[in-house]
């Protein structure tokens, strides 16, 4: 799949990583509570790209826990396999950040039943103010359905999640992208 959007594809302020492709996916259908859903997962061949790995023993997080030393020599690309046990928490997640203070916030909000990826502080995002808006109806809906909407690029996107005691996230980070797969 293409990792861009026609609204801002021609104004993204980069050349090298402009209009990249996302990881290849395997699509499948599953039934839950009588409804049919589509699932997407990275193709099995993605595992062959892995090199070195590091494992962190399970730990409990109160307010914050920093693991930046684990990612100190990643050369801008890495995968995080993360298992979250909700316990009594209603919101849990992580923040990916760089030395410039730019960050992407990834979290699960159980009250809202949403997995959120917020890229409003992910770097140069102000070009989104010049993006071509959606049709009026869709644009208003996008503003209402987004989280922290700034413009059609700088916003938080989300996917629905069911309440569960544990979640497994597979997060792929590259120099210019973040892709998340849940359970």
Predicted segment positions?
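Beta-rich accessory regions
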Residues: 1-182
């Amino acid at each position: 799949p293409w990792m861009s959007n026609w609204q801002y594809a021609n104004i993204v302020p980069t050349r090298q990583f402009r209009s990249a492709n996302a990881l290849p996916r395997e699509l499948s259908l599953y039934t839950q509570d009588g409804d049919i859903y589509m699932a997407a997962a990275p193709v099995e061949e993605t595992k062959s790209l892995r090199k070195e790995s590091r494992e962190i023993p399970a730990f409990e997080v109160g307010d914050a826990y920093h693991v930046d030393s684990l990612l100190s020599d990643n050369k801008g690309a890495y995968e995080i396999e993360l298992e979250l046990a909700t316990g009594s928490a209603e919101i849990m997640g992580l923040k990916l950040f760089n030395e410039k203070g730019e960050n992407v916030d990834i979290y699960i909000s159980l009250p809202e039943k949403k997995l959120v990826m917020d890229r409003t502080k992910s770097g140069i995002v102000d070009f989104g103010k010049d993006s071509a808006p959606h049709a009026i109806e869709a644009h208003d809906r996008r503003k209402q359905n987004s989280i922290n909407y700034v413009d059609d690029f700088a916003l938080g996107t989300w996917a629905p999640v069911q309440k569960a005691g544990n979640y497994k996230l597979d997060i792929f980070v590259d120099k210019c992208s973040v892709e998340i797969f849940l359970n």
